[in-house]
Design a protein with these regions (language model features):
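Short beta-strand/turn micro-motifs at beta-sheet edges
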Residues: 2-6, 67-69
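N-terminal helix-turn-helix DNA-binding core of bacterial DNA-binding proteins
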Residues: 5-47
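Alpha-helical residues within the helix-turn-helix
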Residues: 33, 56-57
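Basic amphipathic alpha-helical segments that dock to polyanions
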Residues: 48-55
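Beta-hairpin "wing" of winged helix-turn-helix
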Residues: 58-73
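Exposed loop/turn and edge beta-strand positions of beta-sandwich/beta-sheet ligand-binding modules
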Residues: 76
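Amphipathic alpha-helical dimerization/coiled-coil segments
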Residues: 85-112
Length: 112
C-alpha cells in the first residue's frame, strides 16, 4: 500500500529533522534547543506546538506522554516520533532540493 505524503513547509521540515536527530529524546524543550543550535532560529513554544499538532493530524508524527515528573510540577512530557509518512515526506523534500541545486553555481559568501 502506498503512503500518502503531504508536501512540507520549510518549518515542518526543520521540525521533522530535529525529531529525527533527537530520537527518543524529542519533546518540546529539546526540539526548540536542537532547532536553535542547528539553525540559529528560536521558535516560540506556540509555533512549535501548532506545527506539531498539524503534523500529527497529517500523520507525519505521533506523540506519546511520558511519566509525570516532580520537576515539571507533576506534568508529563509529550514525546514525538516521526512516522513512515514523515520520513517519506522529508526524503521527498530533500530530493526536490537536490534536484533544484543540481548544476547551480552559488556565489561564495563570506561570513563575518
Amino acid at each position: 500500500m502506498r503512503i500518502r505524503v503531504p508536501a512540507l513547509g520549510e518549518f515542518e521540515q526543520v521540525v521533522l529533522l530535529a525529531i529525527l536527530r533527537l530520537g527518543d529524546r524529542a519533546y518540546g524543550v529539546t526540539m526548540r534547543e536542537e532547532i536553535r543550535d542547528c539553525t540559529n532560529r528560536e521558535p516560540t513554544p506556540g509555533a512549535l506546538y501548532t506545527t506539531l499538532d498539524r503534523m500529527e493530524e497529517k500523520g507525519l508524527v505521533r506523540s506519546r506522554l511520558g511519566d509525570p515528573t516532580p520537576q515539571r510540577g507533576g506534568r508529563a512530557k509529550r514525546f514525538f516520533q516521526v512516522t513512515a509518512a514523515g520520513v517519506e515526506a522529508v526524503a521527498r523534500a530533500q530530493r526536490a532540493y537536490r534536484q533544484l541545486l543540481r548544476g547551480l553555481k552559488l556565489p561564495v559568501v563570506a561570513h563575518a
